[in-house]
């Protein structure tokens, strides 16, 4: 029942929300938002377990699949689409599904979140298998679309995890690993796009970033698998080579082009004073980890 969910309770601090001036509303929101990171902190051990499972999937050439409805689904897609430019992944490695399909990203599709079978259809469409990890996201922790997806994922032997913003969430029963970030009542009653959505975004940031570090997509604190898809990222790539090696911008740019715009290879070429082919071979042996290649 909705009334039993803490995310649906009325916030005692904002009973007069409609009487506040603009600054008071903003201060109230900011005050509530400060509690979110602390709520996430309490779940770090559970998030760590999820990351380990995702890394294992990646090492076995499996995928990370997010499923959710409404804001939760949009946040999963947002995290997924940022992985290729940030970490050089292909667009299949991390994917997001939203109840009602991609059109639901910009406009609500009535009733889609209430149909368990839609998630099964979505996961079947990508050939979900036992190497993959499916993470179901639902602020309420009770969305049928997410439950249906987790049920199907379990049936094919995939790893499963859930992210919710209520304790003892319904979706936790259907996932092998659970993250329950208790964000409590929103300033606007039931509007879980606020604190709950912020918490979900923080957790997704943690999962994708830590997992990519775990498979060699980062050297020191540099995103060395960045894809140079625009001028800003081309410049960032050259700056990463400068930061990683200490050479001048000009030398970094030269090696960047010699390495066919492969930042990792350029770094190895500079630091080991080797040719492009040798750098690639060292990275292959090191399974993509720059530090190991060096």
Swiss-Prot record:
Short name of one Pfam family: GKRP_SIS_N
InterPro entries for this protein: Etherase_MurQ, Glucokinase_regulatory_CS, MURQ/GCKR, SIS_dom, SIS_dom_sf
Domain SIS: residue ranges: 54-217
Keyword field contains Lyase: yes
Protein name as annotated: N-acetylmuramic acid 6-phosphate etherase
Known partners and oligomeric status: Homodimer.
Record lineage: Bacteria, Bacillati, Bacillota, Bacilli, Bacillales
Species whose genome carries this gene: Bacillus cereus (strain ZK / E33L)
Name of the gene: murQ
Pathway membership: Amino-sugar metabolism; N-acetylmuramate degradation
HAMAP family: MurQ
Domain of life (superkingdom): Bacteria
Residues annotated as catalytic: 82 (proton donor), 113
Keyword set, alphabetical order: Carbohydrate metabolism, Lyase
């Amino acid at each position: 029942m909705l009334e039993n969910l803490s995310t649906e309770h009325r916030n005692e601090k904002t009973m007069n929300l409609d009487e506040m001036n603009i600054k008071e509303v903003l201060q109230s929101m900011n005050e509530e938002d400060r509690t979110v990171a602390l709520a996430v902190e309490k779940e770090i051990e559970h998030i760590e377990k999820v990351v380990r499972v995702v890394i294992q999937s990646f090492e076995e050439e499996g995928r990370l699949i997010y499923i959710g409805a409404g804001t939760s689904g949009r946040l999963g897609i947002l995290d997924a689409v940022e992985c290729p430019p940030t970490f050089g992944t292909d667009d299949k490695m991390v994917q997001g599904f939203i109840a009602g399909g991609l059109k639901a990203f910009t406009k609500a599709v009535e009733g889609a979140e209430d149909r368990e079978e839609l998630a099964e259809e979505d996961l079947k469409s990508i050939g979900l298998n036992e190497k993959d990890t499916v993470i179901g996201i639902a602020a309420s922790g009770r969305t049928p679309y997410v439950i249906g997806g987790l049920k199907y994922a379990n049936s094919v032997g995939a790893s499963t995890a859930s992210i919710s913003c209520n304790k003892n969430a319904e979706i936790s029963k259907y996932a092998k690993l659970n993250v329950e970030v208790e964000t409590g009542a929103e300033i606007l009653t039931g509007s879980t796009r606020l604190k709950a959505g912020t918490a979900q975004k923080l957790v997704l940031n943690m999962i994708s970033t830590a997992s990519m570090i775990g498979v060699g997509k980062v050297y020191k604190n540099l995103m060395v698998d960045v894809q140079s898809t625009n001028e800003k990222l081309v410049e960032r790539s050259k700056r990463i080579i400068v930061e990683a090696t200490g050479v001048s911008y000009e030398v970094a740019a030269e090696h960047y082009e010699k390495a066919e715009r492969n930042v990792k290879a350029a770094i190895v070429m500079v630091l080991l004073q080797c040719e492009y082919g040798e750098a690639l071979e060292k990275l292959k042996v090191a399974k993509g980890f720059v530090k190991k290649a060096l």
